[in-house]
A protein has these predicted regions:
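A short, small-residue-rich loop immediately preceding and capping a beta-strand
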Residues: 3-22, 29-38, 125-134
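Active-site-proximal loop->helix
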Residues: 20-65, 164-176
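Hydrophobic beta-strand scaffold residues
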Residues: 33, 60, 89, 152-154
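Conserved mixed alpha/beta catalytic, RNA-binding, or beta-rich assembly cores of soluble enzyme
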Residues: 143-147, 159-160
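Active-site/ligand-binding loops adjacent to catalytic centers
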Residues: 152-193
């Protein structure tokens, strides 16, 4: 991590796996973490990742609404607030920043390599993999599966409703990730399940 940061700032839905991972990484780096979250249809009950943010010591602001595409606006407001307080935040747009989505997708492709080793140890190959994913997770799984030449069908189950064409965004993340990894692969939205 380059830069003179003293905290991270990111946001998504209240049950975001990405936010949970970001908070855990910040803790490992001895950085404070700030989250801007929307409950949406998930409700306000302290459970799952929303509970883990609390256990991990994240500073959480919950904004009202159900349109997650409004999160970047709220992140910018929180960023300015932290700057005024003298903090030095690393702003991570996560699923809302095009470069962030590609890097996160690549991290999930790397996780697929770990799964590949485990399956080989068990002399097993999955024919289907179901992932709860908004965009980055599924993109990384799709990318990793193709790089590893798996016959596996990746089936995404999105916990989030998006106005944008999410299959096109997943294909974009796959294509940009493949390019960064020098993998000669091409994805279309028709390939995404």
């Amino acid at each position: 991590l380059s830069g003179n940061y003293d905290c991270i700032l990111t946001g998504a839905s209240s049950q975001s796996n990405f936010c949970r991972q970001a908070v855990a990484a910040a803790n490992k780096l001895n950085l404070d973490s700030f989250l801007v979250l929307m409950h949406g249809i998930k409700g306000k009950m302290m459970q799952g990742n929303f509970l883990l943010y609390n256990i991990l010591g994240a500073n959480v602001d919950v904004v009202e609404g159900e349109d997650l595409e409004q999160i970047p606006k709220h992140l910018d407001l929180k960023y300015n607030e932290l700057i005024k307080e003298g903090r030095k935040p690393l702003l991570i747009y996560g699923g809302f920043g095009k470069e962030d989505t590609v890097l996160a997708g690549i991290s999930y492709a790397n996780a697929m390599a770990e799964i590949d080793l485990q399956m080989k140890d068990q002399n097993f190959m999955a024919d289907h993999l179901f992932v709860t994913a908004a965009n980055m997770t599924q993109a990384g799984c799709e990318l990793g599966a193709k790089i590893l030449n798996w016959p596996t069908r990746i089936q995404g189950v999105s916990p989030v409703y998006w106005e944008m064409n999410i299959k096109k965004d997943i294909a974009r993340i796959c294509n940009e990730g493949a390019k960064m990894l020098d993998a000669n692969l091409e994805f279309t939205d028709r390939m995404i399940n």
